[in-house]
Amino acid sequence: MITKTLTGELGLREYLSQVDNYCSNGVDSGYVGDYKPEAECIEASKAIYAIALNESLNKYGQDIGLEQVLMENLANILIFSYAADSTLSRVLQNNSKADELPGLCVQAYVAEEGIKVVEYARKIFNSIFDSSNMPKDIKDKFDKLDKRLTLDTDIIGIKKVIGEKTVEAGGYPVKNY
């Protein structure tokens, strides 16, 4: 992915301009429907990934591959973005079923991992900029995206409900979603 970004195959510049619009429009993707906070969290994770990748490439260029810890944090953000997007899509496709468990799982997962994305991004930006030297535009975007990534979800309460439903079912109800 880094190679494709460096060669211009992925269009990072175009996506970054979309991220600028996203951040200047109140960090709202325009999504309407169930699980809006989760959808916005996922979009914010993609945006923060693009900004972190761009700033990493600006600092390290083609030597970015040598920065293993930085690459690990970038990968963690990307893995969350993909897994959460895929999970939410499956839940929305099967939303007509009476089972609320998948929806609860996606709410807990996205809320819990969104907080981790903020931590990963903060580590990346702290390695690129001195804590007091982060450019104002990057800091403003980070602060806006942080609000979308940090959901006001009762993760513990949701996990209790998931546990209770699992016990009621006599184990994890394994279904193909």
Question: What label would you give each PLM region?
Answer:
Residues M1-Y177:
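Flavin-dependent oxidoreductase catalytic core characteristic
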